[in-house]
Amino acid sequence: MDFSFSSEQTLLQDSVERFIQNDYGFDQRQKLTGSELGFSKEHWSHFAELGWLGLPFAEEDGGFGGSAIDTMIVMEAFGKGLVVEPYVSTVLMAGSALAHAGTTAQKESHLAAIIGGEAQASLAYIEPQARFNLNHVVTRAVPDGSDWVINGFKGVVLGAPSADLLIVSARTDGDEQAEEGITLFVVPANAEGVSRRNYPTIDGFRASEVTLSLSLIHI
């Protein structure tokens, strides 16, 4: 059994490691973590130009149809450089949720913007009472005509300070610990009724506590 990389994967590895070596020295990273934004928009645009933001997504969704090994190559190099750009929160968490659960219209709009580097997104799913039980969702969404009204709180939403979109888990049926009845909603981060308390994490990333109060979401 051959575990060596393909020629394309070797080129990808060389490309990402070259970026880390040339553009992500310790002093450069320190400047980024100390900035107001916490990362570099120029780096993010560079990721889009090189196709890294579209790497794990299917070709029919505008991505490059990369494998888990391709993503591992990028993440291994990012780990070496302690990269603080919100790749995990936007691409691997929120982006994957959109790719697997989003409608065709949501993919064409939001996923395309993520792949192009034009938008960032965060997956808002952690609630303080849940501990590690992902079924324990108190945030609730109730229908209002063709809209949904969402009320609740999400903690440690990685990448949320810079996010344009929040992928929010909310209960639409059942009691607060039921396995069924949880729905994901695409919520504009600047929507009325959405507030964020932003803070830096110990490893240099940014996160938010997100409160949704009578947030009206059109579906």
Range-by-range predicted roles:
Residues 1-8:
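Intrinsic disorder at enzyme termini
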Residues 9, 20, 51, 58, ...:
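Buried hydrophobic positions in well-ordered alpha/beta secondary-structure cores of metabolic enzymes
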Residues 27-50:
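Short secondary-structure junction/hinge motifs that connect adjacent elements
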Residues 49-108, 112-117, 159-165:
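Internal helix-loop-helix
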Residues 139-141:
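A structural signal for short hydrophobic beta-strand segments in well-ordered beta-sheet cores
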Residues 151-195:
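A short core secondary-structure module
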Residues 217-219:
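Conserved small/polar residues in nucleotide/adenosyl-binding loops
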